[in-house]
Amino acid sequence: MNIPNKELIQATIFSNCLCNSPYYDLNKLQTDRLNNLVENSRKLSPFYKKKFSYLPDRNVRLEEIPVSTKTELMEHFNSWITNRSLNLSEIKKYLSNTSNIGKPIFDKYLLMESSGSSGTPGIFLHDLKAVEIYHALEASRRANSSLLNQFYWHLYCREKIAYIGALNAHYAGITSICYSKTCYPQLKSTIKELSIYNSKKKLAHSLNIYQPSVVASYPSVAITLAEDQIQGILKLNLREVWVGGESLDQYQKKFIQSAFNAKVFNSYGSSEFPPIAWECDLGRLHVNADWIILEAVDEK
């Protein structure tokens, strides 16, 4: 299950060279990839073949593509997925075993499920070539000043990272960590997972014993930890705090930074596509727009 480092390096070099090239045309790249996606979806997914039947054969524009909700996709799961040998019942059986978290089903697809915050939980399959791209983006496009910029390199092994999240299901965060540890064994001694459902006392005790240099979690958790640090419940000497999965305003960010005297870096992702956007050194979120197009679908 190891992905050769040379493949990561090649994908990373391509990612960087593409963005820095004077011939880089983002609009054209988006259009080409969007049309390839529509073409393959029509070809391999009965659900999309029917839904996209009225679209033109080529030069499809984003605004022409009908919205598909998670409820709709899950109701038509077996005709939605592009691998006809898979079905929802066997995927749910695989997901029900928490020991499978981070282990690709049939050694081909990494499974991620959403929490259902929008009303319906979703299940998403990521082929391992796509995951390679995620790793390349992680390795090449994080803020230059952040330790995140070293995520898959050996230099990173000197850090101690505490990931605080939901560990009891195939959510994007814990799934990505477990799979990354398989691909890059050096991360096994670098990252410690702690359950968000632990009591406040137990979590504080675990963190004080572990003494991480980095904490990664949701903004709401980071704020609670910052309060504990100020009150002396926590005694941590952090270098950075990484947050994502919830909104983070500037006041919250400054509070966390002040409490820990550490840099705070925000990110935005989803189970559908984990590496959507990351924060730069100037505090702005930048979308990986060569791989994803963000669109407002309604007034909410």
Protein language model regions, located:
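Conserved AMP-binding loop of ANL adenylate-forming enzymes
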Residues: 145-182, 193
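Short, well-ordered, mixed-charge alpha-helical segments that flank or form enzyme active sites
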Residues: 122, 131-134, 169-173, 224-225, ...
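Nucleotide 5′-phosphate-binding alpha/beta core
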Residues: 1-113, 120-151, 155-158, 209-216, ...
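Active-site glycine/GP-rich loop and adjacent strand/helix microenvironment
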Residues: 1-39, 46, 183-300
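Glycine-centered flexibility sites
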Residues: 116-119, 165, 244, 269
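Short glycine- and Lys/Arg-enriched binding-loop motifs that mark or flank ligand-binding interfaces
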Residues: 112-115, 265
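Short glycine/proline-enriched loop/turn "hinge" motifs that connect secondary-structure elements
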Residues: 103-105, 179, 184
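Glycine-rich, histidine-containing beta strand-loop boundary motifs that form or position
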Residues: 125-128, 165, 219, 268-269
